[in-house]
Amino acid sequence: MSAGKLPEGWVIAPVSTVTTLIRGVTYKKEQAINYLKDDYLPLIRANNIQNGKFDTTDLVFVPKNLVKESQKISPEDIVIAMSSGSKSVVGKSAHQHLPFECSFGAFCGVLRPEKLIFSGFIAHFTKSSLYRNKISSLSAGANINNIKPASFDLINIPIPPLAEQKIIAEKLDTLLAQVDSTKARFEQIPQILKRFRQAVLGGAVNGKLTEKWRNFEPQHSVFKKLNFESILTELRNGLSSKPNESGVGHPILRISSVRAGHVDQNDIRFLECSESELNRHKLQDGDLLFTRYNGSLEFVGVCGLLKKLQHQNLLYPDKLIRARLTKDALPEYIEIFFSSPSARNAMMNCVKTTSGQKGISGKDIKSQVVLLPPVKEQAEIVRRVEQLFAYADTIEKQVNNALARVNNLTQSILAKAFRGELTAQWRAENPDLISGENSAAALLEKIKAERAASGGKKASRKKS
């Protein structure tokens, strides 16, 4: 189908001409409970709509007498999030047969397709960018984004003949399931790589990573067990003065700039200080930084190495601690050591909570036990860890690129479906199923006649 031209037998029509919108159940907060009880029905809310399906792990239940018959979800219904504080949530949909009787709340609505419209076709349309983009432009509100019932008069949908609707829905079911399966496999890889990196760090500090390397060394290499304090020339807290965001003074790292194995020199504020304070707290290449305090346990005591200074004068705050080492220890190796699982566990065991903040003292950091091989082996460990991490980073980048392509593939397939490209051959083989009485135009006339006979669309809405 060329741009702007519909396939033979198709028509464009507002969603409201082929579906009826049913509004959700209104109830008071005290009328809802979080467990099943006699004469109560489970209620779908916007948070239960996830990836086109229903997540029923967090349902509420309301008295059955609040629920009209038309507000009970049928297998053909497409449940829509009608209101939300998040624009991305408004309009999201779910279409799934539930094995129990269920209704939906006032912040949701149901698109109930007419009998001559295949529900799976409408459900797939609500996943498409055609629908999502229009919903985004129509939803509005001061604090809450809403779709009004009249919005569905303004959202156009390409309508094929009924037989073709079913074929399109079946093809999309198959193709999108394959896409989802591929996506799920890709999404597992970052966790696999995370475990791989942790295994590398563990092997680096227990000697396994360089076990074979040691066999070729003239002198047997031994890992010494010693307190961190014994290889320190300095352990100093940062500046306690309040920084500014206006760019006045010298750059100073934020607490969040230090993560395990990384220092982000772009994560900064600014601080005016005296010359003596600058000289005492100015960072240099090879400095190790530890987080002294953080609201999250996983970030307390993490160690990052300043590998290449990007600022002429860079300071650090009092919630970070700077460590400088003797010549017996490479800072790159010590960063690896304190990022390893065993060292992180030991560090977290020393964490104390004060006024909601989790922290560790300089004394506790000094007392940490370090496994230290000779400098030559430290250098070999650093080389191997960097090599393996670079390998993992390359894979992760490739996976992220592939995931982006897979995510785009879903919308590409949906776009082709609603342009008629997935069923071009089927139409050529079945001309009788797309023309005359079987055309979409004839189908819409039948729907129009049935609505007129039953009192029209507005009457249907009032009955809900």
From Swiss-Prot:
* The keyword Nucleotidyltransferase appears for this protein: no
| Record keywords, A-Z | DNA-binding, Restriction system
Induction description:
Encoded in the hsd locus, in the order hsdR-hsdM-hsdS. There is a promoter upstream of hsdR and another between hsdR and hsdM. This probably allows expression of the methylase enzyme before the restriction-specific subunit.
One GO MF term: DNA binding
Enumerate the Gene Ontology biological process terms.
DNA restriction-modification system
Say if the entry is tagged with keyword DNA-binding.
yes
Q: Which InterPro entries match?
A: Restrct_endonuc_typeI_TRD, Restrct_endonuc_typeI_TRD_sf, Type-I_RE_S_subunit
Q: Which SUPFAM superfamilies match?
A: DNA methylase specificity domain
Q: Which GO terms describe its cellular component?
A: type I site-specific deoxyribonuclease complex
Q: What is known of its domains?
A: Contains two DNA recognition domains, each specifying recognition of one of the two defined components of the target sequence.
- Would you identify the family this protein belongs to, as annotated? Belongs to the type-I restriction system S methylase family.
Q: What does this protein do?
A: The specificity (S) subunit of a type I restriction enzyme; this subunit dictates DNA sequence specificity. In the presence of the R subunit the complex can also act as an endonuclease, binding to the same target sequence but cutting the DNA some distance from this site. Whether the DNA is cut or modified depends on the methylation state of the target sequence. When the target site is unmodified, the DNA is cut.
Subunit text: The type I restriction/modification system is composed of three polypeptides R, M and S. The restriction enzyme has stoichiometry R(2)M(2)S(1). The methyltransferase is composed of M(2)S(1). (Microbial infection) Interacts with Escherichia phage T7 protein Ocr; this interaction leads to the inhibition of the methyltransferase restriction enzyme M.EcoKI composed of M(2)S(1).
Miscellaneous notes: Type I restriction and modification enzymes are complex, multifunctional systems which require ATP, S-adenosyl methionine and Mg(2+) as cofactors and, in addition to their endonucleolytic and methylase activities, are potent DNA-dependent ATPases.
- This chain's protein is named Type I restriction enzyme EcoKI specificity subunit
Q: Which organism is it from?
A: Escherichia coli (strain K12)
Q: What is the lineage of its organism?
A: Bacteria, Pseudomonadati, Pseudomonadota, Gammaproteobacteria, Enterobacterales
